[in-house]
Amino acid sequence: MAQSMLVSGANGTVAAASTSRLQPVRPTPFSRLVLSQPSSSLGRAVSVKTVALFGRSKTKAAPARKAEPKPKFKTEDGIFGTSGGIGFTKENELFVGRVAMLGFAASILGEAITGKGILAQLNLETGIPIYEAEPLLLFFILFTLLGAIGALGDRGSFVDDQPVTGLDKAVIAPGKGFRSALGLSEGGPLFGFTKANELFVGRLAQLGIAFSIIGEIITGKGALAQLNIETGVPINEIEPLVLFNVVFFFIAAINPGTGKFVSDDDEE
């Protein structure tokens, strides 16, 4: 009896093991395959989208760049550092230069006609040592020399106008005149003389007046006589070079010039 029970138990164990081995070999039903794949792929897609959404939210915006400040015009302090003290700007120096050009042209023309230098025309004593000259005259010479070399300080700057180039300058537009055909500006000055050029010519005139006065104080001769140019003649017999200088300085003084003055305060 006991042997039969052991044999039946062993047979049951063997049968259970064989059934467990056969189950994995069985094919999976088609319905289970069809229904299980979309759910897994859908879950993966949803999980990927969720990660993508959370990933976008974590991105940081790039910091905005600050606008770079515009470069300021350099302030010229001069020899004595008086740029911020007396407020001598390039615009003031341009005015002084225009006055110097008019004065220099008038003194040359007057000496060519009368034969007298600029000091002799004003009935001032000449032909004396420089230290015996009038104090006001010496101050004028010193001020003119310092202004001519820019020692008083010249704040600000002259900015030239943008030149017109291309077809707008090469072709005569309808309604324009003869100046456009020659390449000249229609509404501006004729010679295109800028304020920066006029400032340079004004400094030359200041130097010319200062040295001609110094020479006349010491020698008693005017600017033309110091250069051995004939003076005291009618205007139609004056040297052509002298007349050219007179006309040049006169036109340069009254010419408005192109460009504009920009100060340090405007730039700030």
Swiss-Prot record:
Consequence of gene disruption: Impaired energy-dependent nonphotochemical quenching (NPQ, qE) in high light conditions leading to an increased susceptibility to photoinhibition. Reduced seeds production. Reduced photosynthetic CO(2) assimilation in high light intensity. Accumulation of superoxide and hydrogen peroxide in chloroplasts. Accelerated cyclic electron flow (CEF) due to an alternate PGR5-dependent CEF pathway conferring a photoprotection of photosystems in the absence of energy-dependent quenching (qE).
Tissues showing expression: Expressed in leaves (at protein level).
Membrane topology according to the record: Multi-pass membrane protein
Residue range covered by the transit peptide: 1-60
GO biological process per UniProt: nonphotochemical quenching; photosynthesis; response to high light intensity
Record keyword DNA repair present: no
Repeat region (Sequence), residues: 54-161, 164-268
Transmembrane segments annotated in the record for this chain: 99-119, 133-153, 199-219, 234-254
Family, similarity comment: Belongs to the ELIP/psbS family.
Function: Involved in high light-mediated energy-dependent nonphotochemical quenching (NPQ, qE) and thermal dissipation (TD) thus regulating energy conversion in photosystem II and protecting from photoinhibition. Also seems to regulate quantum yield of electron transport in fluctuating light conditions.
Protein name per its UniProtKB record: Photosystem II 22 kDa protein 1, chloroplastic
Source species: Oryza sativa subsp. japonica (Rice)
Gene name tied to this protein: PSBS1
